[in-house]
Amino acid sequence: MLSRKIAGAALIVAAMTGCAGAQNVKHGYFFAGGHYIDTKGGQIMAGQMYVESRIPANVTKPYPIVMIHGAAQTGTNFTGTPDGRKGWADYFAEQGYAVYVVDQPARGRSADAGNAGSITRFTANILERRFTATAKFKEWPQAALHTQFPGDGPNKGQRGDPVFDQFYASQVQLLRPNSVSEKLVRDAGAALLDRIGPAIILTHSQSGPFGWVIADERPKLVKGIVAAEPSGPPFRNAVFGTQPGRLWGVTETPMAYTPAVSNPKDIATVEESTADGPNLVKCMKQAEPARKLTNLQNLPVLVFSAEASYHAAYDHCTAKYLKQAGVKADFVRLEDAGIKGNGHMVMIEKNNLEIAAMINGWLDKNIR
């Protein structure tokens, strides 16, 4: 019985994502980047990135949107939802944007050459506790507010619920450490922009730093960044441990700073004396005078966090760091925009199009 429910949900997803705007939007795909490497059996390609395109017949926006998924995910995060609703890719194509949805190198349809890093996967238990059923586990204070993950019944957001099972079926491997993926996406993302021209980058979670490194690599071709709950906060982890992370501020790998930095230890830091509010972390920032992120100066950036996500405790720190480093960064808490109950997987939750509309409004005001 359960398998029939799962199969039914899969058919719904296929129907919804395959037909949305099909008469007005041209669908296609190509690969960006990549190079041949030697193996015992001969040469294979490594580092290439699958790119799926949705090009409206009438493109009305000046720049396309490139959507980059997070850890253990694929571009399906943006092409539909596990319960068969419209995804962000189709929504933004309907708004007049050309849309490009990627699978990160060594992920999904971007084949892993086996030469990059170690491979791991998220367990179902991790997803339940951190993404889909957080109100049941309450591992951080805001988790109790989570209401927007789709599904019905007592197992909503957990194994046995057909929507959760569809979501978990979509999970793939991820590379560790994150610095490996940063380097791969920096190169492939630059190759993508070299092909399509100037673009807006939309990131989520693990891919948050990928927006920063692509802009660092191709500053003239990145016209804006939307960072949905980007990996953070600066310099050290939060909520699930406080070990060092993102030693270059918002990335694991080198960024161009002014004055220049050759070793991340040269970036002098200081912790804020007080947090911005209850259940929020105290941010790490640069000691003044702060170095500037050379290639991100005045770049329009939107960072936003969801009300019930573990990111609610610290995403403001990422936005603060960017602003201190000369980036034109805005920070929005979804609940302050009247969008309540969301967890980390904002693009597939029940009100995903309400969130997309908020992003669309910001883009209309800030990207020229």
Language model features: what each stretch is:
Residues 22-60:
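N-terminal cap/lid segment of alpha/beta-hydrolase-fold proteins
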Residues 134, 150-163, 169-172, 177-200:
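Conserved acidic catalytic loop of the alpha/beta-hydrolase fold
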Residues 202-211:
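Gly/Ala-rich beta-loop-alpha elbow adjacent to hydrolase catalytic centers
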Residues 210, 310-317:
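Conserved alpha/beta-hydrolase "acid-adjacent" motif
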Residues 297, 303-305:
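Short beta-strand/loop motif that positions the catalytic acidic residue
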Residues 339-341, 345-368:
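Catalytic active-site module of serine/aspartate enzymes centered on a nucleophile-bearing elbow/loop
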